[in-house]
Amino acid sequence: MMSQLSWSREGETLLLTGELDQDYLNSLWDARHEAMQGVSCIDLGGISRVDTAGVALLVHLVELGKKQGTDVTLLGVSENVSTLAALYNLPQSALPR
């Protein structure tokens, strides 16, 4: 079965569902400015898979939030995301929880 990435908004939360990887993240990348407008939390609870491209996108989304004047936190961070962040020596501020 082919999976994909989808997202929706609930107030100030961006809910991500599916696979956050290089094969599926282009649509979110293209809509990142609109998707992040007013977002203070990114919920990863619905993510089934993530790769390094997905982690890079998360770092970018957090930075985009900062540029828009909002501190963004991540909710539902999987062990996979934490492991990839540690392997790349990302500071806690890059993927704040």
Task: Tell what function each PLM region has.
Residues 1-53, 59-97:
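STAS-like cytosolic regulatory interaction modules
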